[in-house]
A protein has these predicted regions:
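Non-heme di-metal
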Residues: 1-207
Length: 207
């Protein structure tokens, strides 16, 4: 499962491209500078996750399937800034805590660093989507569900909720529909301060 999560690092640069494409359209002027900074963050995230993948090794089948998912996100017709927001809020905000629970020290450190950036990204993208009146289509939501289900597919039912597939799928659903996932509040007891301990009314809430 961790190697599937790592394989989705291939989504980092496309998310940056989604934001870059949006900058060429109707994005509000005041949001442009921070969105341009977010694009640079995605490049750094791709590099950092690449180092982790090198250390862990990759699953060739998972890599191929992740690239197919990346292409599906790229080709989806919804607005690019909306795709970026959904991917970061309801996919990455699930995978990063999963890496913190299931990964080694290096993976936990990288996920914490990325998380601090992602809180800004989601806040910015959410505000831009609201300003433009954008809402995810049913087909984009279906793609979101398929993506997180693919990552967590190797997990089954477990008495340890952090190894239970339904726990993570439900977390993605709640982040998508409610903007919060209270079931992830235990991450506040992880070794390092988690990104979702920072108060921001525009962010998904975990507690």
């Amino acid at each position: 499962t961790l190697r599937r999560a790592l394989a989705l690092r291939h989504m980092e640069l496309p998310v940056g491209d989604f934001i870059r494409d949006a900058l060429a359209s109707e994005v509000p002027f005041l949001a442009r500078e921070i969105l341009e900074s977010n694009v640079q963050d995605e490049i750094k995230h791709d590099r950092a996750l690449g180092y982790v993948a090198d250390a862990w090794g990759v699953d060739p089948k998972a890599e191929r399937e992740a690239l197919a998912l990346r292409d599906a996100w790229t080709e989806h017709p919804d607005h690019t800034i909306l795709k970026a927001m959904v991917a970061e809020r309801a996919i990455f905000f699930v995978l990063l805590p999963f890496m913190r629970f299931a990964g080694d020290a290096g993976m936990r450190t990288v996920s914490a660093d990325i998380s601090r950036d992602e809180q800004v990204h989601v806040a910015t993208n959410s505000l831009v989507c609201r300003e433009l009146g954008l809402e995810a289509s049913p087909s984009l939501d279906k793609l979101r569900k398929a993506t997180i289900a693919w990552v967590m597919q190797p997990l089954g039912k477990s008495s340890d909720k952090y190894l239970d597939k339904k726990f993570w799928l439900d977390s993605s659903d709640r982040l998508m529909y409610e903007g919060k996932a209270p079931q992830l509040s235990d991450t506040q007891r992880a070794r390092m301060p988690a990104f979702f301990e920072h108060a921001n009314q525009n962010l998904p809430q975990y507690a």
